[in-house]
Amino acid sequence: KRFTEDALRIMRAVRFSAQLGYEIEPETKAALMEFAPKLTCISSERIQAELVKLVISPHPENLKIAYETGITKVILPEFDVCMETEQNNPHHCYNVGEHILKSMQKISPDKVLRLAMLFHDIGKPETITMDDQGICHFHGHQAVSEEITLKILKRLKFDNYTIGMVTKLVRYHDYEVEAKEKNVRRAVMKIGEDIFPLLFQVKEADLEAQSTYLQEEKKEKLKAVQRVYEQVAAKGECVSLKTLAVTGKDLISEADMCPGPEIGKVLHQLLDIVIEDPEQNERENLLK
């Protein structure tokens, strides 16, 4: 009866189980399945609020209950397809959906990070191929996952900050960086100073939710990159226009350049020089 009064209580039932760690009784599950289609009447904003509470709860894996009871079929059909997509690949031991659930468990309960794990492989069903040995591959799933994530977050009326952060983490979750200072500086410049450090948590959670095949080697490789990043950050080396020793105003006043698009091009060329050799980040050097 309560579910008929406010369909959002269907989602709340799953959310409470995730927050408090209890099992939902069979009769309640049956009622959830019966009334789940009524969620189509609930506003995107209210669904978003409940989804976030579930995702940042101590048991985000209880999203599986939402799948089993037909809730995600209404609010997140893209996830249902993941629950039905196998990953026959030595690097994986779960299907796409189960891998997503495990990865959410392995990361801190922050809204942006948990949403990034929820969506990081959401594009895999659309990119699946199988080779002659029957091994599944998902080439280009990162870009497709980003596109789908953007659509979902907009559909659920998320704020622009969350959309920006989550889509970038999804786009770069598999980005490979060599453990050398120059390579790390370039990666931070490309990905962003706000996003890059969060990727270590995302990548670690992703690895923890995979098979043990080469897992320790992958973890050590990730730690090596993190150590280099921490060295770069500790030295305060320039990795963006924000900390470049010259500005557009300097180019106009000191180098007799005219305002326009050319200013931006020159600043990026100077940033490239500084990324290669941080010692060049001196105003006098760059204005020569």
What residue spans do the PLM features occupy?
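Glycine- and charge-enriched loop/helix tracts that form the active or gating conduit
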Residues: 1-118, 122-140, 144-157, 261-266, ...
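A ubiquitous short alpha-helical element
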Residues: 1-2, 33-36, 133-137, 188-190, ...
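Charged, alpha-helix-enriched surfaces in structured cytosolic catalytic cores
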Residues: 5-8, 46, 98, 161, ...
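Short alpha-helical linear motifs
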Residues: 51-56, 90-91, 187-194, 209-210, ...
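Short, motif-level signal for alpha-helix interfacial/capping segments enriched in acidic residues
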Residues: 97-101, 185, 225, 235
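Divalent metal-dependent catalytic cores for phosphoryl transfer on phosphate-bearing substrates
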Residues: 103-218
